[in-house]
């Protein structure tokens, strides 16, 4: 192996709450353990709640292969019609909301079910599945953070793990 991808960053680290310091130390140990096996590239992301967000887990390619797919309008649909979040106009333009509404009208029940599964169920190999109420509760933990706060928390995380990464 040359790369380890998607080592989860716990939400408490992203929020800098509760036991985040212990979790960062655990992450440092993970980095050191991976490096001890001559793997020097580790990929991760810092998204709230889920490790990856995709809106379709089985997008058919022209070659008949399957791929993961992300559709921004479907995320708006997910927030608007599945999570039933308020104040979407603070995150999305009127045009985006209107386009999402149009797309939603074209979706069948199975399309909505698959969208919900893709976003809340994670990748096919993932064992983590959330109910709508669990997902909303976890998302609510981020309600007081804006993009600047999240970026600052990411900077702090990187500042703490970089010495271990550079040493190994």
Q: At which residue positions do the language-model features occur?
A:
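A cross-domain feature marking catalytic cores of carbohydrate-active enzymes
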Residues: 3-6, 44-46
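Active-site acidic/histidine proton-transfer and metal-coordination neighborhood
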Residues: 11-168
């Amino acid at each position: 192996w040359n790369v380890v991808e998607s080592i989860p960053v716990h939400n408490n680290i992203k929020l800098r709450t509760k036991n985040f310091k212990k979790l960062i130390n655990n992450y440092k140990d993970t980095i050191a353990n991976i490096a001890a096996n001559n793997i020097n590239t580790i990929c991760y992301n810092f998204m709230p709640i889920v490790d990856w967000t995709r809106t379709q887990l089985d997008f058919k390619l022209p070659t008949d292969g399957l791929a993961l797919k992300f559709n921004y309008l479907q995320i708006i649909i997910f927030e608007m019609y599945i999570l039933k979040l308020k104040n979407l106009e603070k995150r999305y333009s009127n045009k985006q909301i209107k386009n999402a509404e149009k797309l939603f009208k074209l979706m069948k029940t199975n399309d909505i079910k698959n969208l919900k599964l893709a976003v809340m169920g994670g990748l096919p190999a993932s064992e983590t599945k959330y109910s709508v109420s669990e997902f909303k509760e976890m998302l609510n933990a981020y309600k007081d953070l804006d993009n600047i706060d999240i970026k600052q928390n990411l900077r702090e995380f990187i500042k703490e793990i970089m010495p271990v990464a550079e040493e190994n």
